[in-house]
Amino acid sequence: MKDVILIANAGSSSLKISIFEIQNKQVKDKIYNIFLEKNDNKILCYINKKQESATDIKDDAIEMMIDLFEDWWKKQENLNLIATGHRIVHGGKNFNKPVIVNEKVSEDLRVLIPLNPLHQPYNLQVLDLFLQKYKEIVHIACFDTSFHFTNPPITKAFGLPKKYYAKGIIRYGFHGLSYKYVSSHFKEMTKEDLPIKTIIAHLGSGSSLCAIKNGLSLTSSMGFSVLDGVMMGTRTGNIDPGIVLYLIDHEKMTTKEITELLYKKSGLLGISGESSDIRTLLASNSPDAKFAIDLFVYRIVLEIGKLTAALEGIDGLIFTAGVGQNSAVIREMISAKLSWLGIKIDDTKNQKNEHLISTESSKVKVFAVPTNEELIIAEEVIKFL
């Protein structure tokens, strides 16, 4: 029988479960990749990318996903579950490292739901269901915000009265599990040391950038919420707060309507009127699609300039996540606007998605590497075994 750990990553309409085999307190292999998603009135279940079932939704979708997983799990007689790990997007001011989840921890995390309504409720719903169903094993919460606890106070503060800082209205930063994976596995992937002053660009449906100095987070593009920073698939990125006040006072929009607008109807989707998927927009002939891509690139270039200033220089630029790792076109567009930094891209290496894509004469080394949030969570979980 194989000892395994389960890694869960829940969203509002999907649940990703990765199952890793463990030997001698080391992660050996990922043996199952399970993806459940809500699609119209059904829940689709994929195991190792093959669709296994389509079930009518009759109850709470997330609970049904867990039940479907359990039905499958009961048939896996050769697997012994010894622990679970959970991606929790927001750890607030107190959770600076992974923790074993108990009732107190669960309560403390629930208090943070208003800070991240997009992810936190579903992260915690799945965590609580596993706590109820598998009481005899340990359950570990790993936080996207923890990586940024090394940020100095000057990078966390907003220009609000001091009492709000004390209440936790600060810049937290997100995508920390991705940044931790890339920075800690960088040499293994590229055979190079992580540059001293590095910017990692995590570009996907949600996007952010992080300035890393000597392997530690200095500051990042996302702040109090996952809305901040660069424009994303359906999220605005950074906007003037006066816009929100205007929408309330003059457009008579409710906070619920504004939340829907900022989180789900803006970004690439809102600008293009077509899609939140960068591949679809790159293939489109629509002027609005082109403008959406140009704005996406422009905002990223501005952010790289800001983070370079925070680092007081830059030695390395690393692209990662779905768009960052796989879109040679977007990497080229961004890099072309950074020639003032001495960045030069090797077109052949870039098109082949090689890890090192800059030329030998480039003053900044540029890389494209995968991220693996599930694996970094698994590596954290085994530290508790």
From Swiss-Prot:
Q: Which BP terms does GO give this entry?
A: acetate metabolic process; acetyl-CoA biosynthetic process
Q: Note the Pfam families from the entry.
A: Acetate_kinase
Q: What is its main location?
A: cytoplasm
Query: Which pathway features in its UniProt record?
Result: Metabolic intermediate biosynthesis; acetyl-CoA biosynthesis; acetyl-CoA from acetate: step 1/2
The positions flagged as active site in the entry are 144 (proton donor/acceptor)
Q: State one molecular function term (GO).
A: magnesium ion binding
Q: Needs which cofactor? A: Mg(2+); Mn(2+)
Q: How is the cofactor bound?
A: Mg(2+). Can also accept Mn(2+).
Q: Where substrate is bound, by residue?
A: 87
Instruction: Detail which positions bind ATP.
Output: 16, 202-206, 277-279
UniProtKB keywords: ATP-binding, Cytoplasm, Kinase, Magnesium, Metal-binding, Nucleotide-binding, Transferase
Q: Which GO terms describe its cellular component?
A: cytoplasm
What SUPFAM superfamilies does this protein map onto? Answer: Actin-like ATPase domain (SSF53067)
Q: What is its EC number?
A: 2.7.2.1
SUBUNIT field: Homodimer.
Which HAMAP family does its entry note? Acetate_kinase (MF_00020)
The free-text function statement in the UniProt record for this protein reads: Catalyzes the formation of acetyl phosphate from acetate and ATP. Can also catalyze the reverse reaction.
Q: Which PANTHER family match?
A: ACETATE KINASE (PTHR21060), ACETATE KINASE-RELATED (PTHR21060:SF15)
Similarity remark: Belongs to the acetokinase family.
Record protein name field: Acetate kinase
